[in-house]
Amino acid sequence: MALILKTYQQQAKDALADYFNLAQSVGSASAFTKLTGLPYHTKLDDVPNVCLRVPTGGGKTLIAAHSIAVAANNYANTNAPVVLWIVPSDMIRNQTLNTLSDVRHPYRQAIAATYGDRVKVCDLGSLQTINRHDVGKSCIVVVTTIQAFRISKTEKRNVYAFYEELSPHFSSLTPQQEAGLEIVTAETLLEQPYLTQADIGRVKHSLANWLSMCNPILIVDEAHNTKGKLSFETYKRLNPTCLIELTATPQESNVLYSVSAAELKTAEMIKLPVVLTEHPDGWQACLRDALLQRQQLELDAQKDSNYIRPILLVQAQDKNGEATVEVVREHLISSNIPAETIAVATGDIKELKDINLFSPSCAIRIVITVDALKEGWDCAFAYVLASLQDMRSAKDVEQLLGRVLRMPYAKTRPITSLNKAYAHVVAESVAFAASMLKDKMVENMGFNKWEADLAIQPDLGLSGGVATPSQKITPEVSLNLQHMPDTQLFAKEVSDAIRILPTTQGAMLIISKGTDSDTFTQIELAIVKSAPENMLKKHKKRLMMPVQLGRHLAHLKLGMQHLHQLHNFV
């Protein structure tokens, strides 16, 4: 049964359809600016190139699967598209290939909803097996990494090599079809000596040329990993119909639609807040309390009508550290943790391979890794992260934190403790640990500053090593203003809830902990009214524009509205 899209996922899909429809008539750049009010980064000439920004845990792959038909129907005008699905690593390539190939998986079902059984999924290694007659009749999805294509000297990559097996796809080409395709050169002969001087000037029967002829729809997952001049030169060689990027942290991208972490929380996609516990006494104490935390959650999970087996994800130190994978495993076993409940997932040891962690018959409750699970691994049963690396030098801890954010069954649980994620870290102070995690959530997970402030909740104490329910904590949040408000006319409720500090750009508005929604509204009105008249006139002028994200007060108002939404985070 296909998954029903969450509201924000459907809105992202609709935004993409609106953009492609408009781009057909006015061009890619004009369509983007008209719909967003933002300047367009032209990197692929007039080929549409847009980005959907979705934070960690938001279901980017499902949106990507649905975007195939959106692009094919609203821009490519084909019912048999060729799709080049680009991922950042071999691990994610294998995972994506498996899920798209599985007719029972929601990602494959999202594609099949449009194309039925006319779907062919392959990687570059098996692309040669695609029948010539499948082209133009089936939706062909090729999953690969950018590394397979990205190089300045193309003769150094197999994807650009001449393959006789591909020759049927290149028969009877017209001069127009041959234009722009790579040809055999003297350099090619050096890499493929079975070719002769007579072949120089021939169109290469290569995988890259075949893709170029097909004008593929490019889908780039985790697009922030594939930026740079060489990447876009590579995209141009592939002669795409359009490019759709998906990432939590866009960099110089044309962001068409942006999802907030607050929307993911509202849509019941992620567990928040993250209850953070610091351990200044070292990794043994960190691991001990994380184990107790997981045990308590398993007791809580027995009250849930759905099966949940909370999993502890342990980030061990690398081979040069004290708490290596081997040491941690032995420590657990010597602490009477059954060996069959422990799995190791590293670059060399892959004990999770072919294991269904969601099965009630699965015994695994603890997964030990270093950084192998930082991407390409998702298990909604993962609840607790224990990072045994010192927070001052911890690597990829935010990536692993993302592994414990997904909500089981994408539905808020009836037990409060099961709606939160838990992080135990080796650090001297919770303030330092929280600051580090917040910065990393903003930089690498797609959270904004307000969301990160509210997403991390310090644990106020442990009882027997198990976190106890704590009072609701709403951290202070701040907003930069481009003017210094006159607070003399502010109501007492407003003055009591805020602090205003002068800055070189204007002022910083600090909203106190625990501020209720009614006071938020009063603060918004007071700040807007306090703005200089010339700023208000500019603001009103902007509001008359058809589509305008605006600056100055428009940013302020958007920020204040967002704070309303975030107020329900914890």
Named regions from a protein language model:
Residues 349-441:
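Conserved RecA-like P-loop NTPase helicase motor core
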Residues 58, 151-211, 291-375, 380, ...:
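Conserved C-terminal RecA-like helicase domain
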Residues 61-78:
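Walker A/P-loop NTP-binding motif
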Residues 81, 125, 134, 206, ...:
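Catalytic cores and motor modules of nucleic-acid processing enzymes
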Residues 1-53:
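Conserved pre-motif I regulatory segment
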Residues 79-111, 145-154:
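Conserved Walker A/P-loop ATP-binding site and its immediately adjacent core
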Residues 225-273:
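Post-DEXD/H (motif II) to motif III coupling segment of the RecA-like Helicase ATP-binding lobe
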Residues 221-222:
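Walker B catalytic acidic pair
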